[in-house]
């Protein structure tokens, strides 16, 4: 059994390229079905897609990295060569190590951030719903979650970390003297917007509003913060009312365009606007950043802010890597053992067939009036002969060196490793 992974993340690919490979959670099931149908042996598969990474994990009898890469490139509308220039490919122990590091927050833009673990669990559930999970990937991810839990409870990896949402508040505080005097608009109602709204609400802004495609979901989030709710369609006409705009939706196209922002600035008489686009692909057209009085930040722009305290946690990183190393070794040991499962199943089936045949024979003997002692003797002798026949035949076949190797194997299996005395004496002479 082989395990492989490939992907691209904030370390290897720019934001706009990552945006081509972003999948909403409700897209994962059909996407996985398409992936598996495109591969010859339909391996187990899981797809993880966040604002900072898109990764595919597969497990199958044979490694199919090249075909997986070609499928992903086609799905994103780019050439395989372009994707390879920005992607990473990992196999077996390296794939397992990467999964464990991702789950533990060691590969995140925000070192030790906990959100990635929930995102991985969502990805696993989606793969299960798609019928794409099997024993191997189930083990890989359950062990990833266990390792992540141990890392978080045994180390200080998450101490003093700054989330994207907290970084947005910090940057807003550098632009506005008092966050209590501003009006904040949140576009979307997902987990990232929930976190951002929580952090901004702690600063008691003058007003908060949530614009979302689904009013029900928007109202549910808004009720926690005493915020106003509006439809996405109302956003262009009301954009000028807000000093800060935080956006993170699953839209595949920008929902805040250059023209809308230009009109908002004009109505604001060019009072500055703070905008954070946490979405991948982008929610806000990149040209907006060129406007005077607009301070637009993307997830990649926030990277330097969230690095605060990273150096002071290098000891925790080293401790986490030790835990991860042990987890990788245990997983690879389990994976190696899995290679023997088909043979074990065949041996059990063969032994059951022999047993069934001897029982049939014994019943016939009993029906003919044979004594129980004689029937038991015949049955046990028959089973013994069947079990030893193959080994006996191999011991008489081949040249001397092959017979000696066979003798060692047979003694290990049937004599607990003790070589017969005659064979030992021949070896000593």
Curated annotation (Swiss-Prot):
Residues of the site described as Important for activity: 98
Gene3D superfamilies in the cross-refs: Glutamyl-tRNA reductase, N-terminal domain (3.30.460.30), NAD(P)-binding Rossmann-like Domain (3.40.50.720)
Binding site for substrate: 50-53, 108, 113-115, 119
Pathway: Porphyrin-containing compound metabolism; protoporphyrin-IX biosynthesis; 5-aminolevulinate from L-glutamyl-tRNA(Glu): step 1/2
Residues where NADP(+) binds: 188-193
EC code(s) of this entry: 1.2.1.70
Family annotation (PROSITE patterns): GLUTR
Keywords of the record: NADP, Oxidoreductase, Porphyrin biosynthesis
Active-site residues per Swiss-Prot or TrEMBL entry: 51 (nucleophile)
Source domain of life: Bacteria
Catalytic activity entry: (S)-4-amino-5-oxopentanoate + tRNA(Glu) + NADP(+) = L-glutamyl-tRNA(Glu) + NADPH + H(+)
Gene Ontology terms describing biological process: protoporphyrinogen IX biosynthetic process from glutamate
GO molecular function, a single term: NADP binding
Function recorded in the entry: Catalyzes the NADPH-dependent reduction of glutamyl-tRNA(Glu) to glutamate 1-semialdehyde (GSA).
Family the entry assigns: Belongs to the glutamyl-tRNA reductase family.
Domain comment, as recorded: Possesses an unusual extended V-shaped dimeric structure with each monomer consisting of three distinct domains arranged along a curved 'spinal' alpha-helix. The N-terminal catalytic domain specifically recognizes the glutamate moiety of the substrate. The second domain is the NADPH-binding domain, and the third C-terminal domain is responsible for dimerization.
Other information: During catalysis, the active site Cys acts as a nucleophile attacking the alpha-carbonyl group of tRNA-bound glutamate with the formation of a thioester intermediate between enzyme and glutamate, and the concomitant release of tRNA(Glu). The thioester intermediate is finally reduced by direct hydride transfer from NADPH, to form the product GSA.
Subunit: Homodimer.
HAMAP family in alphabetical order: Glu_tRNA_reductase
Protein name: Glutamyl-tRNA reductase
UniProt source species: Polaromonas naphthalenivorans (strain CJ2)
Biological classification of the source: Bacteria, Pseudomonadati, Pseudomonadota, Betaproteobacteria, Burkholderiales
Gene label: hemA
């Amino acid at each position: 059994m082989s395990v492989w992974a490939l992907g691209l993340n904030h370390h290897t690919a720019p934001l706009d390229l990552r945006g081509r490979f972003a999948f909403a959670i409700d897209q994962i099931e059909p996407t996985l079905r398409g992936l598996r149908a495109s591969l010859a042996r339909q391996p187990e598969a899981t797809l993880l897609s966040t604002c900072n990474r898109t990764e595919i994990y597969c497990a199958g009898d044979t490694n199919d990295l090249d075909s997986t890469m070609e499928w992903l490139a086609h799905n994103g509308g780019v050439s395989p060569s372009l994707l390879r220039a920005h992607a990473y490919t990992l196999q077996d122990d390296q794939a397992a190590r990467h999964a464990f590091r991702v789950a533990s927050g060691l590969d995140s833009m925000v070192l030790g951030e906990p959100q990635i673990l929930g995102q991985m669990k969502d990805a696993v559930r989606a793969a299960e719903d798609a019928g794409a999970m099997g024993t191997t990937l189930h083990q890989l991810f359950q062990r990833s979650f266990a390792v992540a839990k141990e890392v978080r409870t045994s180390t200080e990896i998450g101490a003093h970390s700054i989330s994207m949402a907290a970084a947005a508040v910090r940057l807003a505080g550098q632009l506005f003297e008092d966050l209590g005097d501003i009006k904040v608009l949140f576009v979307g109602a997902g987990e990232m917007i929930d976190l951002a709204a929580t952090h901004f609400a702690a600063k008691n802004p003058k007003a908060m509003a949530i614009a979302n495609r689904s009013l029900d979901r928007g109202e549910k989030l808004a009720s926690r913060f005493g915020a106003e709710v509006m439809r996405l369609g109302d956003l262009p006409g009301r954009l000028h009312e807000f000093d800060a705009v935080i956006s993170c939706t699953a839209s595949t196209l920008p929902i805040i365009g250059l023209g809308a922002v230009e009109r908002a600035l004009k109505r604001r008489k060019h009072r500055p606007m703070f905008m954070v686009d946490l979405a991948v692909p982008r929610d806000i057209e990149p040209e907006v950043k060129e406007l005077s009085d607009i301070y637009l930040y993307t997830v990649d722009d926030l990277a330097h802010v969230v690095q605060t305290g990273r150096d002071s946690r290098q000891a925790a990183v080293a401790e986490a890597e030790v835990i991860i190393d042990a987890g990788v070794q245990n997983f690879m040991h389990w994976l190696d053992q899995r290679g023997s499962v088909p043979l074990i199943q065949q041996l059990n089936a063969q032994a059951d067939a022999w047993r069934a045949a001897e029982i049939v024979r014994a019943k016939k003997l009993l029906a003919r009036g044979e004594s129980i002692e004689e029937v038991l003797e015949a049955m046990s002798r028959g089973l013994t002969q069947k079990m030893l026949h193959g080994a006996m035949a191999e011991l008489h076949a081949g040249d001397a060196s092959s017979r000696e190797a066979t003798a060692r194997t047979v003694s290990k299996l049937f004599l607990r490793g003790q070589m017969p005395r005659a064979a030992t004496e021949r070896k000593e002479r």
